[in-house]
Amino acid sequence: MSAAASPASERGWKSEKLDEAQALARSCAARRPDFQPCDGLSICATHSHGKCFKLHWCCHLGWCHCKYMYQPMTPVEQLPSTEIPARPREPTNTIQISVSLTEHFLKFASVFQPPLPPDSPRYCMISDLFIDNYQVKCINGKMCYVQKQPAPHSHRMSPEEVSAHDALISKESNTPKIDHCSSPSSSEDSGINAIGAHYVESCDEDTEEGAELSSEEDYSPESSWEPDECTLLSPSQSDLEVIETIETTV
């Protein structure tokens, strides 16, 4: 019984393996149209080892099914190894270029430099902000503010310059004087001409009061203006300039 049962069980085991191999072969044939059954040693040279070098199909019980070709792994002991040097404990003469360049950049880059200290505050006197170089003069019998004459130059004039200057003074004295303080209109509006036009609103007609405010020595030929000097000139262009006038009503 046992001898008869053993061949039957062996046939059952082989049939199961055959069915499994055929099932694997059919599944592989569905994915590979060039599937061919294994016909023995002509296709599978190492049929006994389960390898098929021709089509990379594993032969199992007479059928070739597609699997990856078996390659035994190399033991770890046989792999080539490279010795890793131990970290040196003593300092070496080598430096890391990236670190040194970074430190150099952070040290000398203008972006990372501290800002320059601010300048010390400069204090000034309020009186220096106001220019007080004007004086009251009686010009052609009118009281007006005029700018003071600049300090005379230290150099002496040559005889030619002196004669030319005297001729200019005599010419100015013979020239008829223009009343620059007269109003262009007959209006009696009072006030100070702050706009800076070439004429003023009105001036004081009282020459006696003007004579008290000014002296004869203050009056000079330079105080009289030529007719072509009616337009207002800036201080940089003229030494003498009418800034504003004072009007008094008696």
Swiss-Prot record:
Keywords: Neurogenesis. One of its GO terms (biological process) is circadian behavior. InterPro entries: UPF0524_fam. Residues 202-229 have a biased composition (Acidic residues). Pfam families: UPF0524. Residues 201-250 are annotated as: Disordered. May play a role in neuronal and neurobehavioral development. Belongs to the UPF0524 family. This is UPF0524 protein C3orf70. The gene is C3orf70.
